């Protein structure tokens, strides 16, 4: 059972995932870059973690962020890493 989820996406996609998590009583951590520091959707999350702008394409950064915040799983959202099989393998191998 997932209790805490890292959202590895931005903007409206992150909000849609967050809303679904709320319905399922799953805590949400949103990963973001410094460029998004002041985005309003971040205030909706239970927690946030800042990653570098390049991290949206580097799966290891999201895995490290999820582990540092006690997440059980990562939702890649749409685009970025969602279509990357190596990222899926990495997440699985790390027990997320």
Mark where each language-model region is.
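ATP-binding N-terminal substructure of ATP-dependent carboxylate-amine bond-forming enzymes
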Residues: 1-96
């Amino acid at each position: 059972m997932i209790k805490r989820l890292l959202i590895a996406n931005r903007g409206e996609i992150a909000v849609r995932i967050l809303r679904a998590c709320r319905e399922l009583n799953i805590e949400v951590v949103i990963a973001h870059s410094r460029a998004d520091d002041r985005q309003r959707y971040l205030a909706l999350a239970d927690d946030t973690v800042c990653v570098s702008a390049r991290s949206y394409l580097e799966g290891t950064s999201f895995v490290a962020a999820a582990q540092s915040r006690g997440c059980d799983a990562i939702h890649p959202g749409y685009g970025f890493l969602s279509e990357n099989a190596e990222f899926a393998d990495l997440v699985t191998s790390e027990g997320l």
